[in-house]
Structure formats: structure tokens, C-alpha cells
Amino acid sequence: MNYIHQAQYYETDQMGIIHHSNYIRWMEEARIAYMDELGFPYKKVEEAGIISPVLSVQCDYKAMTYFGDRVCIDVKLSSFRGVKYEISYEMRDEKTGELRASATSAHCYLGKNGRPSNIKKELPELYAKMMEELQKVEKEQ
């Protein structure tokens, strides 16, 4: 799935480039849009009593992004093991295709009690969709 973010003036730093912390925010925006597109908005999942915290984030910065640039973020499910999953992101200039950053974020599914949630049992439709997405990505490789 592709998500477009237009770099905002308030996201720039003293050097006139997008501050590195904003790429992490863009990843979250793109991840939320990705889950919406799959038919499982975060709100719907949380209403079912399941939360999905971030376990880790890793981002490699390749080229600078400036105010007004439009960045296309390609979002893919890169692994899914029932409770834990990882999402990969490629952030490219929308016009030139230049790679600006590549990143991953790791997450898990927990019940509101903070314990791992068996979504295969508790949200079987989400589990099936995640498995379908993973198979789609594996076929592309």
C-alpha cells in the first residue's frame, strides 16, 4: 500500500530539512492507513479489547527531505507470527522516486490486561487478513 505525506514546515529543523523524528511519525500515519485499508482500523481492533504497541523502530536515512516535498511511503507486512508482526516502509520522493528512508517497526497484539492476545481466536478475521497479506508479500519476493 502506498501512503502520501506532504512534508510540513513545522517538521523542518534549523538546517531546513525534515527532522529525523518525523519519519517515525510518518511511519505511524502510514501504518494506520494500511490497517484501515485492510479493513481493521486501530479503533475497531481496540474496541475488540486488543491493543498493538510498538516494540521497536529502526530507520535508515538515505537522503534529505525538505518542506513541501511529497513522500510516497510503501508499507508492507514483512513478518507475522500470530502475536508479533513487523512492518517495512520505503519512503521515496513522489516525483523522482529517490529513496529518502527505509525502515521497519515491530509490534505485537496484547489484551487490555497487557498479556499476549491470540488473535487467531479473538479476531479470526484479522488473523486471516494478516496471513493473506504475508502470503501476498512473499509471492512478490
Which ranges hold each PLM region?
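Terminal targeting signals and extreme-terminal segments of soluble enzymes
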Residues: 1-72, 80-141
